Swiss-Prot record:
It comes from the Bacteria. The gene is mtnA. Belongs to the EIF-2B alpha/beta/delta subunits family. MtnA subfamily. GO terms for molecular function: S-methyl-5-thioribose-1-phosphate isomerase activity. Its EC number is 5.3.1.23. Pathway: Amino-acid biosynthesis; L-methionine biosynthesis via salvage pathway; L-methionine from S-methyl-5-thio-alpha-D-ribose 1-phosphate: step 1/6. Substrate binds at residues 49-51, 93, 201, 252-253. GO terms for biological process: L-methionine salvage from methylthioadenosine. The keyword Amino-acid biosynthesis applies. The record marks 162 as: Transition state stabilizer. This is Methylthioribose-1-phosphate isomerase.
Length: 349
C-alpha cells in the first residue's frame, strides 16, 4: 500500500497530484504538490475541495512535511517542524472539520511513535497512515451509499446542491455515493443538480460526474429549486456536509439552508450524507461552527467575466448552517441517524 490513484488525487510516494477542480469541466488540469506548502495552497485555493478530500489531502501534506524534514537528526526538532506543518495546513479552510480530524490523527500517530522510532521509520509510518485514511474514505463512502440507497425508491428524482461526489472525497462520494449505489442496485434514479453559485460546483462538478457515470441529470439554477419542488418533480434532497454539530445542525455549501427550507415547505425529505469524521462532537450546535468568508471576486466575476463594478459591496460566505429540525436523517457509514439528534449522535461516539 504505497500509492493510490483516483479521479481526485494520486499519491506517488514523493508527491501528491490533484485534479485541478477550478478548471473542470472544460479542462482537465493537474497540480503536482511536492511539499506541504504546495498542499496548503491547493486546499486554500480550492484546487481540491470537499471535506473528506480536504482531510485526505492534508494527511498527505503532513507526510510531505515529514519527508522534507527527515534530514534532521534530532527527533524533538523533527516533531516541532511537523507542528509547524500541521499549523500551516490547519489554517487553510476553517469550516471543513475533516481537515482537523485528519491532521490530529496524523499528529497522534507521530506522538505515539516518537519515543521508540527513528525519523526514517516515522516517515514510513506517517505515509502508511495517510494511505490508510485515503483507502478508508473510499470504503466509508461505499457504506454510506449502501445505507442511504435504501431510502430511495425506484423511479425517484433527487435534488442535489454543490458537489458531494467522488471529487469531494477520495473516491465514490457521499451524497452522490447514495445516488450511485441506488443506480448500481438497479434503481432508476434521476437527478436535478443546483448550479451552486458562486463557485458553480453543482454545474461544473456534479453534472460532470453524473453524466460520466451515465446517470440522468438535469441542471437548474439555484433559484429554480422551489419551483421544481412545487411542480412535484423532486422526491428527495441529498446533500453532503462540511461539519455537523453534536445536535445535528449541518454546515454545508452556501445555499443548502435555502434548499432545506424549501424541502420542508413542500414535504420533501432532506437527507445529509457524511462520514462520522464530519461530525464535530465537541461543537454543541451550529452557532459554534466557524463560517469561512471567501474572496469577493468569486461573486464579482463568473470565471473571468465581470458581473459588477468594483464599487459594489459583496458578501461571500462559503457555507451556511441548516438547523437540525430541517434534517430528515443523516446518512453515515455506521447507520442512518434520525432525530432526536442530540441523543442519537452522541450514542455513536
Amino acid at each position: 500500500m504505497k500509492n493510490i490513484k483516483t479521479m481526485t488525487m494520486e499519491w506517488t510516494g514523493n508527491s501528491l497530484i490533484l485534479i485541478d477542480q477550478r478548471y473542470l469541466p472544460i479542462e482537465e488540469k493537474y497540480v503536482e504538490c511536492q511539499n506541504y506548502l504546495d498542499v496548503a495552497n491547493s486546499i486554500k485555493d480550492m484546487v481540491v475541495r470537499g471535506a473528506p478530500a480536504i482531510g485526505a489531502t492534508a494527511a498527505f501534506g503532513f507526510v510531505l512535511g515529514a519527508k522534507e524534514f527527515s534530514y534532521l537528526s534530532d527527533k524533538n526538532l523533527f516533531s516541532n517542524k511537523l507542528e509547524e506543518v500541521k499549523n500551516s495546513l490547519s489554517k487553510t479552510r476553517p469550516t471543513a472539520v475533516n481537515l482537523f480530524w485528519a491532521l490530529n490523527r496524523m499528529d497522534k500517530i507521530l506522538k505515539d511513535n516518537l519515543p521508540t522510532k527513528e525519523i526514517n521509520d516515522l516517515v514510513t509510518i506517517l505515509e502508511e497512515e495517510a494511505l490508510k485514511i485515503a483507502y478508508e474514505d473510499i470504503e466509508i463512502n461505499k457504506q454510506i451509499g449502501k445505507n442511504g440507497e435504501a431510502l430511495l425508491n425506484d423511479g425517484d428524482t433527487v435534488l442535489t446542491h454543490c458537489n458531494a461526489g467522488a471529487l469531494a472525497t477520495v473516491d465514490y462520494g457521499t451524497a452522490l455515493g447514495v445516488i450511485r449505489a441506488a443506480v448500481e442496485n438497479g434503481k432508476d434514479i434521476q437527478v436535478y443538480a443546483d448550479e451552486t453559485r458562486p463557485y458553480l460546483q453543482g454545474a461544473r462538478l456534479t453534472v460532470w460526474e453524473l453524466v460520466k457515470s451515465g446517470i440522468k441529470t438535469t441542471l437548474i439554477t439555484d433559484n429554480m429549486a422551489g419551483w421544481v419542488m412545487k411542480q412535484g418533480k423532486i422526491n428527495a434532497v441529498i446533500v453532503g456536509a462540511d461539519r455537523i454539530a453534536r445536535n445535528g445542525d449541518v454546515a454545508n455549501k452556501i445555499g443548502t439552508y435555502s434548499v432545506a427550507v424549501l424541502a420542508k415547505r413542500h414535504g420533501i425529505p432532506f437527507y445529509v450524507a457524511a462520514p462520522l469524521s464530519t461530525i464535530d462532537i465537541e461543537t454543541k450546535n451550529g452557532e459554534g461552527i466557524p463560517i469561512e468568508e471567501r474572496n469577493h471576486n468569486e461573486v464579482r466575476f463568473c470565471h473571468k467575466t465581470r458581473l459588477v463594478t468594483d464599487d459594489v459591496n459583496i458578501y461571500n460566505p462559503a457555507f451556511d448552517v441548516t438547523p437540525n429540525e430541517l434534517v430528515t436523517a443523516i446518512i453515515t457509514e455506521k447507520m442512518v441517524i434520525r432525530p432526536p439528534y442530540e441523543i442519537n449522535i452522541v450514542k455513536l461516539f
